[in-house]
Design a protein with these regions (language model features):
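Beta-propeller domain segments
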Residues: 84-86, 159-322
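Acidic, Gly/Ser/Thr-rich repeat motifs that build Ca2+-stabilized beta-propeller blades
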Residues: 22-163, 215-224, 228, 280-320
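Bacterial N-terminal signal peptides that target proteins for export
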Residues: 1-9
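Bacterial N-terminal signal peptides
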Residues: 9-17
Length: 322
């Protein structure tokens, strides 16, 4: 769990002011400087980590020596608007996984995932293992966070501003997908078992733009943080074959002009209910479950970053309640 300590430490570099639910105060120490719009990070060991920059770079950084190496790749990364580009990165057992905005044709793009082996500061056999479909010409809501649980790769795919398309499991809009680590499709996925009308990669539907994802070291479940519209950001569990309901519901939020979404309900029977919601929105970004020695008061807490408030928020989550 030492690595989680460093992850928490590094996330603090990008936060101007930190606050928790208990109003604790923390001082920051700069670990590395000179990054250009960093988006994702993943530790290789105690000193080395991978960092993505939205403009398309994958960097290997040594915090001890301050050395920075750019890893070559041939991905068609397109930095779109203020959300798209090279996004998350995950290092797992020698493999590097990245999610990114891929230019497919014209201005049409998708959330895609590539993987390859890291060997002597080189990415070998680095190629796409997933491309969300269909490509669309919008510049928001990519999702794209990555996590590994039980040798499965989980990834979030935003609904790309396609609204009710998040209720149509014959496309990838507004979904959580699950792959084997080599990119193949698990035979136990809903589309191959209980939900035969779903695309085979899809594990869960009905999300809007999940930019946070983490596996809990306590119960070994996958959790997400999801952007609502004007209100309705939430923290919740990833559950096989379930539906969070976007945009039948908006989790307590409204459209940006103040109009209701669906019938105005925050939740309906038959849909998966978020564990915790923020109204008004805080613009939730990434999250971790903290376990470490440096901040014992935060042990087993859920730490959530807020883009809007530029704060780090601590949730005391136990027994499916906050």
């Amino acid at each position: 769990m030492k690595r989680l300590k460093y992850i928490f430490y590094f996330y603090c570099l990008f936060i101007v002011f930190i606050n928790t639910a208990h109003s604790e105060s923390y001082s920051l120490e700069k670990a590395f400087d000179g990054l250009n719009r960093p988006w994702g990070m993943s530790f290789i060991d105690d000193h080395n980590l991978l960092v993505t920059q939205k403009s398309g770079e994958i960097l290997k950084i040594n915090l001890k020596t301050q050395e920075k190496i750019e890893l070559d790749h041939n991905l068609k990364v397109l930095e779109v608007g203020w959300q798209g580009g090279m996004l998350d990165v995950l290092f797992h057992e020698g493999m590097v996984y990245v999610s990114y905005t891929e230019k497919r044709y014209g201005k049409h793009t998708t959330t895609s995932i590539a993987a390859g082996k890291l060997v002597n500061d080189r990415l070998e056999n680095f190629k796409n293992i997933f491309r969300s479909d269909p490509p669309v010409d919008t510049d928001i809501h990519w999702g794209s966070r990555l996590a590994v649980k039980d040798n499965y790769l989980f990834a979030s795919v935003g609904e790309r501003a396609q609204g009710m398309a998040a209720q149509d499991p014959t496309n990838h809009f507004g979904t959580i997908i699950r792959l084997n680590l080599d990119g193949s499709i698990p035979k136990s996925n809903p589309g191959l078992t209980t939900n035969k009308d779903w695309l085979p990669e899809i594990y869960q539907i009905g999300v809007r733009n999940p930019q946070g994802m983490a596996v809990s070291p306590i119960d070994n479940e996958v959790y997400i943080t999801n952007h609502g519209p004007k209100g309705g950001d939430f923290f919740g569990k990833v559950s096989k074959g379930s539906n969070y309901g976007w945009m039948l519901v908006a989790w307590g939020g409204t459209d940006y002009d103040g109009s209701i979404i669906g019938d105005g309900s925050a939740w309906k029977p038959g849909l998966l209910k978020p564990i915790y919601r923020w109204i008004p929105s805080i613009a939730v970004s990434n999250m971790i479950f903290y376990q470490g020695e440096r901040f014992p008061e935060l042990n087993n807490k859920v730490l959530v970053t807020s883009l809007k408030a530029q704060k780090l928020i601590s949730l005391d989550y136990k027994n499916d309640k906050v």
